[in-house]
């Protein structure tokens, strides 16, 4: 009986260790021009309407505690280049600099952008760290 309890305790301890070894958990919500919202997932395409303004709400929870990387270190690439306001060559026009709000271990940014050019555009979101980080690709189809 004691061996079963010890085995269970070791299993739970290793599961807890694995959970803290992975990077931040990120969620993405797209808010449309009419105010409707939907969760979006990496790897799935999202339809946008040319000329319309959207808000991408990004939330991540530092599930491994004591994150050494500031939220501002999150990298957003549009069409392979740093997403920045005032860059007229980018198909998704960023309204202003990306700023984060922190509430304990939860960090949130609301990113306003306009779907400027028709066609397919990719947004890559990257957080680099030794605990798994984050690197995912979102595909937007502007019609």
Residue ranges of model-derived segments:
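Edge beta-strands of extracellular beta-sandwich domains
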Residues: 134-142
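Short, hydrophobic beta-strand segments
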Residues: 107-117
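Low-complexity, serine/threonine/proline/glycine-rich extracellular segments that form mucin-like
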Residues: 44, 57-78
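N-terminal edge beta-strand
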Residues: 22-57
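Bacterial N-terminal signal peptides
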Residues: 7-17
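Beta-strand-rich extracellular modules
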Residues: 126-130
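Exposed beta-strand face motif in extracellular beta-rich ectodomains
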Residues: 54, 119-123
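Low-complexity "stalk/linker" and mucin-like segments enriched in Ser/Thr/Pro/Ala/Gly
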Residues: 38-42, 77-109
């Amino acid at each position: 009986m004691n061996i079963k309890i010890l085995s269970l305790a070791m299993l739970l301890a290793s599961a807890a260790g694995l959970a803290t070894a992975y990077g931040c958990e990120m969620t993405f919500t797209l808010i449309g021009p009419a105010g409707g919202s939907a969760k979006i997932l990496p790897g799935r395409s999202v339809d946008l309407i040319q000329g319309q303004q959207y808000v991408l709400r990004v939330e991540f929870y530092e599930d491994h505690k004591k994150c050494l990387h500031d939220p501002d270190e999150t990298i957003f690439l549009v069409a392979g280049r740093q997403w920045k306001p005032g860059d007229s060559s980018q198909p998704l026009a960023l309204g202003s600099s990306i700023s984060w709000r922190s509430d304990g271990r939860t960090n949130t940014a609301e990113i306003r952008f306009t779907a400027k050019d028709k066609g397919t555009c990719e947004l890559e979101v990257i957080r680099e760290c030794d605990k798994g980080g984050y690197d995912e690709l979102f595909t937007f189809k502007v019609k």
